[in-house]
């Protein structure tokens, strides 16, 4: 029998949690999760998608973020005729106003919170799928065998995934 699976990998999970906690859009807010009490050699636990768009890897060291943002701002300054004004952490603002400097937030890691929210998300999955059909790979990644649920819910796998994540 052919099986149908849904794979869910939450995008930049730690950074997304930090953005949501602040009422910010995780897809457009420049944010890294890192412990500033350590040196700039500390590894960022997460980098938001909008910062990754500047070529910053997901597990960068903090000094790499600092250097890359300096490079980006030097280029923005050159294009803006030598002047950059206020920093912005919002990708939309930066896209529409070339006179703004790229800024970013640094959020300290909150592992207990990430585990708590991951549990809440897992409980949403349990409303639709039995635990024996959910295979947890990490705090933000699951694979679900939904073969036996599609007929029950009269949905495709894509439709079921959309219901679970909405």
Residue positions per predicted region:
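Gly/Gly-Pro- and Ser/Thr-rich, intrinsically disordered tail segments characteristic of DNA damage-repair
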Residues: 1-166
């Amino acid at each position: 029998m052919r099986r149908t699976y849904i794979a869910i990998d939450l995008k930049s999970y730690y950074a997304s949690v930090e953005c949501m906690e602040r009422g910010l859009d995780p897809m457009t807010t420049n944010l890294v999760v890192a412990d500033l009490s350590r040196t700039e050699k500390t590894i960022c636990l997460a980098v938001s998608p909008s910062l990754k768009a500047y070529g910053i890897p997901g597990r960068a060291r903090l000094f790499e973020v600092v250097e890359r943002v300096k490079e980006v701002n030097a280029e923005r300054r050159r294009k803006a005729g030598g002047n950059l004004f206020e920093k912005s952490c919002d990708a939309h603002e930066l896209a529409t106003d070339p006179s703004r400097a790229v800024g970013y937030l640094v959020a300290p890691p909150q592992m207990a919170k990430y585990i708590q929210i991951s549990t809440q998300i897992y409980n949403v999955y349990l409303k639709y799928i039995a635990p024996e059909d959910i295979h947890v790979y990490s705090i933000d990644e699951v694979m679900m065998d939904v073969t036996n649920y599609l007929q029950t819910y009269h949905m495709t796998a894509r439709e079921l995934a959309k219901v679970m994540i909405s």
